[in-house]
């Protein structure tokens, strides 16, 4: 019974230490919504990435041929 109490005490004590050891986030980072300017710039970047992907996707093709069988010198 004493070992059970000691185990509970150790677990409780370590959980208290862990909770007090953590650093709280600044209020600007803890808010769920970002600033409107940041969100707008992210939207513009994503649009530009999608536009470039579409441009490259229509022109890009691989000319590489895969080998027809195992390399005889490999094994």
Swiss-Prot record:
UniProt KW keywords: Glycoprotein, Hydroxylation, Secreted, Signal
Signal peptide positions on this chain: 1-22
Domain of life: Eukaryota
GO cellular component: extracellular region
Disulfide-bonded cysteines: none
GO molecular function, one term: receptor serine/threonine kinase binding
Glycosylation sites: 70
Positions carrying Hydroxyproline: 67, 70
Family recorded in the similarity comment: Belongs to the CLV3/ESR signal peptide family.
Misc note: Roots of plants overexpressing CLE33 exhibit normal growth, but reduced levels of colonization by arbuscular mycorrhizal (AM) fungi.
Protein's name in the database: CLAVATA3/ESR (CLE)-related protein 33
Gene behind the chain: CLE33
């Amino acid at each position: 019974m004493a070992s059970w109490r000691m185990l509970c005490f150790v677990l409780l004590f370590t959980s208290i230490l862990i909770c007090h050891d953590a650093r709280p986030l600044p209020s600007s980072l803890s808010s769920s919504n970002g600033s409107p300017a940041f969100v707008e710039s992210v939207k513009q970047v994503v649009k530009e990435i999608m536009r470039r992907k579409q441009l490259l996707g229509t022109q890009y093709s691989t000319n590489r041929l895969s080998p027809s069988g195992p390399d005889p010198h490999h094994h």
